[in-house]
Amino acid sequence: MAKGGSLYIVGIFLPIWTFMIYIFGKELFLIRKYQKIDSTYTALSQRVKEQYDTSRRRNYFPKVKLSRNSYDDYTLNYTRQNDSDSFHLRENATILMLVRNSELEGALDSMRSLEDRFNNKYHYDWTFLNDVPFDQDFIEATTSMASGKTQYALIPPEDWNRPQWINDTLFEERLRVMEDEGVLYGGSKSYRNMCRFNSGFFFRQSILDNYDYYFRVEPNVKYYCDFPYDPFRVMRLKGKKYGFVISLYEYEETIPTLWDAVEEYLVASEETILRKEDSAYAFLTDSGLVGKHYPVVEANSDYNLCHFWSNFEIGDLNFFRSDEYKHFFETLDAKGGFYYERWGDAPVHSIGVSLLLRPDEIIHFDELGYFHSPFGTCPASYAVRLDQRCRCKSDDESVIDITPHSCLMRWWKNGSGKYFLKEEQDEI
């Protein structure tokens, strides 16, 4: 009975053991199979990594340049400097921010973005301007954020405040009308002070006397890409006097008589400034078809309303200090348009540099991704975006470069042109 019982138990469990051994063997087979597949793909991945290792290290396509507006054959090699380099020669330049104490958080955001993308390698000075004294919190926080020296200056009242010759009654009336009409910043007094200061007084501040170049930065902006070069060095080596990244149309209701004042200046200065054909005058007046687009606004004067967006600008301070530019500004300022209307510093700068500089002295930094609400710019080339670790999409709705609202194509046509591809990289 016991023997028969044992046989019975064996008979019951033998199929179970056999099944378990089968399952275990099958699982072991699958594990080994997947290990083999994983090993195969690991080896393949390693070969791909080694094949494109130079791309991973951001020396992308060393024999192809997708644009050469700023880093051309005789300025900078396209291959970027190794990020591990601990020393970079600096130009005689400063990063400049006009900012209020209340804008500290926005200032820190902009500083962090520019430090990460550019200045942590160069340690350029940061210069901060304000019409009231900076408080200790602002000074401590910005000093901590900067990789270079920080310095702070109080703008003299005579450089900031509304001049005494402005008719207060007319000014208040124009302020009320523009606010009622919904003009952007139409009712703001401080905004007018800022625009006039940026147009004709920022370069007169004594704290800037020892610098040759400035890089204007505003609070709450973003720099999307690593800078592949030092833009200050490009400015010096190529003899550039003004650099921009975005160009668009101005609101005509803010500058209804600006071009009238410019035309008076042109007549009075005809013998002392560049001939129209030698300057970028056509950029300001061309209203024809460019690509698929006519100007989005039909202007009421010969001025097509195109301007360089001055919240990002890199400039030669010695140009703005020149008698030619100061005469240009003072002629316009005497009209009172900064207060009776709402003239912005962007069209004033743009008209000034377009009339007083040759087109080849103005540079479009087309590799530098940037955003200032509501518009941005992003390199169109996928390879460039990879190389510069950009965090933007060239087809994003905020990117304005070749949209109907942009004047960039008009600059390509009437300014310094645009290069799209050059096959060979010459040595410098």
Curated annotation (Swiss-Prot):
One of its GO terms (cellular component) is Golgi apparatus. GO terms for biological process: cell wall mannoprotein biosynthetic process; protein N-linked glycosylation; protein O-linked glycosylation. It holds the Pfam family Glyco_transf_15. The active site is at E313 (nucleophile). Signal peptide: none annotated. Its EC number is 2.4.1.-. The chain crosses the membrane at residues 4-24. Residues 25-88 are annotated as: Stem region. Pathway: Protein modification; protein glycosylation. Residues 89-428 are annotated as: Catalytic. InterPro entries: Glyco_trans_15, Nucleotide-diphossugar_trans. Belongs to the glycosyltransferase 15 family. Present with 6400 molecules/cell in log phase SD medium. Possible glycosyltransferase involved in N-linked glycosylation. Transfers an alpha-D-mannosyl residue from GDP-mannose into lipid-linked oligosaccharide, forming an alpha-(1->2)-D-mannosyl-D-mannose linkage. This is Probable mannosyltransferase YUR1. The gene is YUR1.
